[in-house]
Amino acid sequence: MSSDSQRPRVVIAGAGFGGLTATKNLAKAAVDVTLIDAQNHHCFQPLLYQVATAALSPADVAWPIRAILRNQQNARVIMAQVTGVDVEARRVHTTEVDLAYDYLVLATGATHSYFGHDDWAPYAPGLKHISDATEIRRRFLMAFERAEVVEDDAERQRLLTFVIVGGGATGVEMAGAIAEVAQRTLRHDFRHIDPRRSRIILIEAGPRMLPAFPESLSDYAARSLQSMGVEVELGHVVTGCDGRGVTLKDGRRIDAATVIWAAGVVASPAANWIDAGHDRAGRIKVNPDLSVPGRPEIFAIGDTASVTYSDGRPVPGIAPAAKQMGSYAAQVIAARVEGSKPPSPFVYHHAGDLATIGRKSAVVKLGVFQLKGFLGWVFWSVVHIYFLIGIRNRFVVALNWLWSYLTFQRGARLIGVSSR
């Protein structure tokens, strides 16, 4: 980085899709950029569920942030947790150091929302970070190991029952992957249990799964999961969750050793740090240029920002939206530094939606264009490999998928020690 103290200082909090894109798009700007993240790696979240279900290893879906930005001379990386912002002094507080800024980009993302029941978190982990994925992998693989030695039939069935709460893309992909592990990968590996007798239950509070997709594709996904042995429960709300299973609003009790939460998210505390207006999910309400009202030097992007289409619908909290916001915020900052005309107000361009159901089936919607089944899965695979960071990761993931497709085996079935 330049030692010229006159260069504007840009601090970017969060190295997810939005924060990393903003950093890279400021490479040619006359600014000094500091990127802060609690992790030393950028994680490709769309494939985290494959780490959680033993198809991929953590290193296959992550890349060191410093390696990504190695050749960007105006950027440095600080590994720390942001704890607050002094908007008057223009300083960011972290667990390691305080940083002064001229421009601040808040890209701190979101975490799991248990809708007022945070006490459920220890029993129903969500999927946002590498550590979440490895913990879920440990839990669901250990369930089979424990079922192998338990004598009580009821306890064995509880161990072999897996509940996924939430019928969005993550929930659908998790349910399909766990079903494949039980039905295919593990079917010959145990002597006293038959993994194929496992129960995989997907619970969705709404009338259909994958609500972002056309109803025809949602129905196709439901039928595909059911053909894989997944029990699809639509229109059911979880009202209780503990170490023994879940309770539904209709009074039913489902005993399960493994519960996975994919039902909702809430933004980071960033709105509280800067005392900004926010929506019900904690996302900061922003101006058309993604700056914070009353604080033109502060921007919020990705899951940290509440952004809507012209008709009032919220922009989805997905990677493409975060990347577009990150690129746009960088353009605004660069224009201000150069004294040039600012870009037009931010408009999100939605390319489409994708979700995989299993090893050879997916649903895809790109405008009026729709795919499902094997062709959808091929398209889904190509898109995800293309957007992975690092040639090595793309090559390894492609080989793993080919091996899994041909053999039904998963090469990342190591059970680690719990950190929770």
What are these model-predicted stretches?
Residues 156-213, 231-233, 316-335, 340-345, ...:
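Rossmann-like dinucleotide-binding core of oxidoreductases
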Residues 13, 99-111, 129, 238, ...:
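Short hydrophobic core segments
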Residues 1-7, 75-163, 260:
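FAD-binding core/adjacent interface of flavoenzyme oxidoreductases
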Residues 122-152, 244-247, 253-324, 331:
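FAD-site-proximal beta/loop scaffold in flavoenzymes
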Residues 73-84, 179-288, 292-294, 341:
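A Rossmann-like FAD-binding core segment of flavoenzymes
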Residues 7, 330-420:
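C-terminal, flexible cofactor-proximal segment of oxidoreductases
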Residues 2-79, 83, 169-213, 260:
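Beta1-alpha1 glycine-rich phosphate/pyrophosphate-binding loop at the start
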